[in-house]
Amino acid sequence: DHVYGFSDQKKGNLMCLEFMTGKVAWMERVERELHKGAVHAADGMLYCLNENEGWVYLVEANPLGFREKGKFQLPKETTLRDENNGKVWSHPVVINGKLYLRDQDLIFCYNVKG
């Protein structure tokens, strides 16, 4: 019934829209770590990956409001992404309780089973 994603109007807005009407259910200005990127929904949660610094936010998929459950930053173990070069443009994926994230020439796997 709802769609979650980033607003292009202002940096740092994660938002929830009613699918049928396009009405904004909520819009949250998130810290600079999460101003633009990719969102994946799984098991009632949103896995939000920032394209610049590799921040990952776990947010409850709830049309009543923004509820952050946690965050972490991908380790900077690649030389292909630095302050002046490279973006994390891959999409997070959750399969069988495992969160997969790719950063340039690396892939990370995290256990996200509750």
Regions picked out by a protein language model, each given a short descriptive name:
Residues D1-G114:
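Noncatalytic, solvent-exposed loop/strand surfaces
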